[in-house]
Curated annotation (Swiss-Prot):
GO terms under cellular component: Atg12-Atg5-Atg16 complex; autophagosome; axoneme; phagophore; phagophore assembly site membrane
Post-translational changes noted in the entry: Conjugated to ATG12; which is essential for autophagy, but is not required for association with isolation membrane. Acetylated by EP300.
PANTHER family: AUTOPHAGY PROTEIN 5 (PTHR13040:SF2)
PTM sites of type N-acetylmethionine: M1
Keyword Membrane applies: yes
Gene3D superfamilies: 3.10.20.620, Autophagy protein Apg5, helix rich domain (1.10.246.190), Phosphatidylinositol 3-kinase Catalytic Subunit, Chain A, domain 1 (3.10.20.90)
InterPro entries listed in its UniProt record: Atg5 (IPR007239), ATG5_HBR (IPR048940), Atg5_HR (IPR042526), ATG5_UblA (IPR048939), Atg5_UblA_dom_sf (IPR042527), ATG5_UblB (IPR048318)
Subcellular location, record wording: Cytoplasm; Preautophagosomal structure membrane
Protein name, as recorded: Autophagy protein 5
Family membership noted in the UniProt record: Belongs to the ATG5 family.
UniProt keyword terms in alphabetical order: Acetylation, Apoptosis, Autophagy, Cytoplasm, Immunity, Isopeptide bond, Membrane, Ubl conjugation
UniProt topology in membrane: Peripheral membrane protein
Quaternary state and interactors: Forms a conjugate with ATG12. Part of the minor complex composed of 4 sets of ATG12-ATG5 and ATG16L1 (400 kDa); this complex interacts with ATG3 leading to disruption of ATG7 interaction and promotion of ATG8-like proteins lipidation. Forms an 800-kDa complex composed of ATG12-ATG5 and ATG16L2. The ATG12-ATG5 conjugate interacts with RAB33A; this interaction is bridged by ATG16L1 and promotes ATG12-ATG5-ATG16L1 complex recruitment to phagophores. Interacts with TECPR1; the interaction is direct and does not take place when ATG16L1 is associated with the ATG5-ATG12 conjugate.
Amino acid sequence: MTDDKDVLRDVWFGRIPTCFTLYQDEITEREAEPYYLLLPRVSYLTLVTDKVKKHFQKVMRQEDISEIWFEYEGTPLKWHYPIGLLFDLLASISALPWNITVHFKSFPEKDLLHCPSKDVIEAHFMSCVKEADALKHKSRVISDMQRKDHKQLWMGLQNDRFDQFWTINRKLIEYPPEENGFRYIPFRIYQTTTERPFIQKLFRPVAADGQLHTLGDLLREVCPSAVAPEDGEKKSQVMIHGIEPLLETPLQWLSEHLSYPDNFLHISIVPQPTD
C-alpha cells in the first residue's frame, strides 16, 4: 500500500451534521426537542445513536417504546449500510444538516433487519471483512489473524480509534509486490433507480496485459449506464465518501484508500443534480 495516511485520516474523520427529529405520531409526555449530532461516515447508525435514543426516550412512556429505527424522507435507513453510503445514496444533494426522523413503533419488517444489540452489528461487520479478504487474498490474511486482532478491528471502529483500527487493518490491504494488487477488488455499486440492492461481481485490479484497471473500467463493465458517452450528457454522479473520484483513478488505489472499514468500496450512482 502506498503510504498516504492523510487520505486515510480524512476518510476516517469525515462527519455529517445531522438533525434527528421524533416522528410526529409518536406519543410523548412533553415536546421532544430535535437532537443534533455529527455522524461518522465510516460507522453505522445503530452504533453511534445511543445518545439519540436516550434523548427521545426521556419524553416517552416506557410502554410506547419498542425498537428504534430511522428514516429519511419516507425511506427507512438500513443500519447495516455505512452512514456515509446512506447519505451519498439518498441525501447527497440535500442541504445540511441531514434531517433524519426517529421512530419507536411500526418497525418496517420488509425493509429493515432487526438490530437488538451491538453484537449483531459486530457480526455483520466481521462477515463483510472476511468476505472482502476472501476476494483480496483467498482469506489468507484474516485466517492468520488471532481472535484479539479481529476484536481490535471492531473496537477501533466502535470507539472511533483510527490508530487502533489501522494497526490491524493495514495487514488487510497489503499484497505481494510482484502481484501489483489484490486478487479481486471488493466493491458494491448502489443505485436509487433500481430495486436491486447492489451490484457485486468479480473484478481484477490489473488487466491481463499488466495495466491497472480504473474506476471507469469497472463501471463500463458492470454498470455502463453510469458512464456518460464521450459526446453525450452526463446523467449520473459516481460518489464514494461524498466525493466524485476521477474515472481514470486506478481501482487498486481506491480500494486501498477509500474503502470503508468493512474493506469494501461502497460506490453510489445518483442522478446528476440539475441547477
